[in-house]
């Protein structure tokens, strides 16, 4: 089967952290955000807001809070994608339906909305020759993000996104085989042999890539990432912002 241009673009996705010192074209960011808004949204609630961060001081503070990710400071654009139930609450009150009560379903719908929008923005950016990287590290110290961006109650920063013109090509990380992801009629445990084969493939990738070479495989890298990024403060933070209260 021949891939379409869109499919090829999706399969070639890679994270870009090194950018040329070159701004986006006038109006380009607004087009990308419009493409993001075209993503599916639960019940058309559009529960997202995006903060464009241009202040060098704010970028630096966020970069430090995110674990020293200096590309936040250097990218042509840095965006913070937020789950926004504040605007939804405003609409509910305007319609005479009362205030939101922090139901988990509402929070989950907002999180999904933001994720879908973010992926649409990234794909649209890559279609124009831009590159970027998602920044989950803003959840390390989310209260810093709230303070820096003056985020009100019922607005939660979920992830950041650096965008710009790539300064260098990076390798595409090998994904798991489709057979390990696509199940039929019922869930199936991953075949240990298939997992071992994938670990071997990732081990070769990590050892031979152009930067950040390391001796690891998918299982060990994943275990290290999950155990090292528990972010035990997140649930309390979300509830303090009016999310997942009940």
Describe the residue ranges of each PLM region.
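Acidic, surface-exposed loops and disordered segments
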Residues: 1-246
């Amino acid at each position: 089967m021949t891939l379409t241009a869109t499919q090829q673009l999706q399969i070639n996705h890679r994270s870009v952290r090194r950018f040329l010192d070159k701004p986006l074209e006038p109006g380009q960011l607004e087009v990308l955000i419009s493409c993001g808004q075209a993503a599916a949204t639960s019940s058309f609630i559009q529960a997202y807001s995006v903060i464009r961060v241009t202040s060098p001081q704010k970028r630096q503070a966020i970069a430090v809070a995110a674990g020293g990710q200096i590309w936040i400071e250097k990218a042509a654009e840095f965006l913070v994608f937020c789950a926004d139930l504040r605007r939804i609450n405003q609409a509910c009150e305007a319609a005479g339906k009362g205030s939101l009560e922090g139901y988990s379903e509402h929070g989950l719908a907002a999180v999904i909305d933001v994720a879908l929008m973010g992926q649409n923005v990234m794909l649209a950016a890559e279609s124009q020759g831009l590159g970027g990287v998602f920044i989950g590290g803003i959840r390390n110290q989310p209260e810093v993000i709230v303070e820096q961006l003056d985020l009100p109650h019922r607005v939660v920063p979920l992830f950041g996104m650096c965008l710009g013109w790539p300064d260098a090509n990076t390798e595409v990380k090998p994904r798991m085989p489709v057979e390990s992801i696509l199940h039929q009629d019922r869930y199936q445990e991953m075949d240990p042999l298939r997992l071992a084969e994938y670990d071997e493939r990732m081990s070769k990738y990590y050892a031979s890539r152009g930067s950040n070479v390391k001796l690891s495989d998918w299982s060990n890298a994943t275990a290290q990432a999950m155990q090292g990024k528990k972010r035990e403060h997140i649930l309390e933070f979300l509830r303090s912002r009016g999310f997942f209260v009940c």
